[in-house]
Amino acid sequence: RKIMVNLTIDGRQISVEENTTIMEAARSVGIQIPSLCYLKGINEIGACRVCVVELEGKDRLITACNNICEEGMVIYTNSPKVRKDRRTTVELILSEHDCQCVTCMRSGNCSLQKIANDLDILELPFHQYLEHQPWDKTFPLIRDSAKCIKCMRCVQVCDKVQGLGVWDVEGTGYHTTVNVSGHNSIREADCALCGQCITHCPVGALRERSDTNEVWKAIEDPDKIVVAQVAPAVRAAWGEELGLAPEDATVGKIIDALKRMGINYVFDTTFSADLTIMEEGNEFVKRFTSGELKDRPMFTSCCPGWVRFIKSQFPHLVKYLSSAKSPQQMFGAVMKTYFAEKLGVSPEKIYTVSVMPCVAKKAEREMDLYYEEYAGHDIDAVITTRELIRMIRSAHISPQTLVDVESDRPMHEGTGAGVIFGATGGVMEAALRSAYYIIKGENPPAEAFTAVRSQGFNENDGVQEANFQINDITVRTAVVSGLGNTRGLIRKIESGEVHYDFVEVMACPGGCVGGGGQPIHDGEERAFERGKNLYYLDRNANLRFSHENPDVIQMYKEYFEAPMSHKAHMLLHTEHKKNM
């Protein structure tokens, strides 16, 4: 039986369950107490003190985010005393914050900017002091110390959710600040580039390196043929900031926008996701049936945040990664060989652009192991979903005027199996659909492997386990998202507590749909809802098995001969080195 607590907030008598915070109680009746540092279950430290309220009978104001409701409390969230204190607190925060909003990527989507406007703060009464720490601007993740408000969100998310501890507090008193742990440079840190610190920062102190100018230069270069790909997870989120409903924010409209910008050819990454499944699925069947996976499972390799993580934290397990490149890199390799030959041009003329939900993809593009086969990198530029939105706006494209345009040929088709790559469990499900076919010679029911789908991203420590029987073979699988959850799972594998044959890992909670390059909604976690959108698209797709993609089949006939062939190994696989 639930125990209820009765209290009064701003004259309203309410009843809430015990252990409810004052902030949660207020929100339950539509009273939005402002906050900057609060993240439910992650950062409840009352550091910013913007959420202070007045408790009748007490002189000192208390923070609403981490004080529990008690029987008979009388709370005032907007008394003169509260308003004066909150305003002074925000003015002090602004005195240590670079307020050049017009040059900040978060302008218009900044919690501090909104609170300052709501409090009618039009000038700063305090002398401004800004901290300037050096930063490597070539790194895919950028930190601007002058914008940091010391809310500690990045510290807590990296530590509690991702288990990496890249960020830490240094200094004391007035000189307290946040920096890379251990006085290291960011390149020396074990940063996986998941970007969760970016999406949980309430201001613009953390962002991705912008590569939009490089893309515009390529578009303007008459000697370049610009070819773009759009990742599955992007279609689930790009419309959020552009006023488009999920059902209207189609991949066809992204293709239209990119073509209007001047990009010559646009493809859907679901094609190369299907190609990845053909290679990775066949690789798994080969390694599994040969007995190679008796001691350790084969791990998926399409998430670069996870690949960076295993290289820095568990380098002895790198050999168990699938050798298949990610869909992004396979796409680039195919564009600069197969597609270049189709066009009759040299690979150097092709400029490949990836639109990704991910910051780590920017680093994956730059890794040495991806440009040994021919001149240049597989991928020339990576932009996040947020960068795509900025490019659409800067090109003066009205989202409401966009129409559905089909992707170009010959890499035109994509299957539902490729679409669900963007959600946790999607790669595993797609791989099992085709592995079943490889082993049995017939398709399984399309819904046969839904047990690997996450029911909610806070259950089972972020791990989904499932065993599947294919003929006389039992395949033991696990799916995990979030690097903190991943570390826990690997420790169990290492100790012998659990045994699997195939493990899918996604660095971001919920998978790519919750990626570090996706639109930011402060205080909201939208990965699960975005993931449901991708599963809907899969359910309604004409093709649901990667091995049935006619354009993939045709490419093997014309170019690669068969999955795992010598040519496929040269272009679609890689040797994972232990260094980042």
Task: State each model region's role.
Residues R49-L193, L206-D221, I225:
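Fe-S ferredoxin-like electron-transfer domains
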Residues I9-R12, E56-G57:
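Short strand-turn-strand beta-turns centered on an Asx-Gly dipeptide
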Residues R12-E18:
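A short N-terminal beta-strand-loop micro-motif at the entrance of redox/enzyme domains
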Residues G195-S210, V382:
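Phosphate/diphosphate-binding loops
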Residues R1-I3:
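Short, Lys/Arg-enriched N-terminal segments with co-localized hydrophobic residues
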Residues E18-N78, V82, R209-M580:
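Iron-sulfur-associated redox domains of electron-transfer enzymes in respiratory
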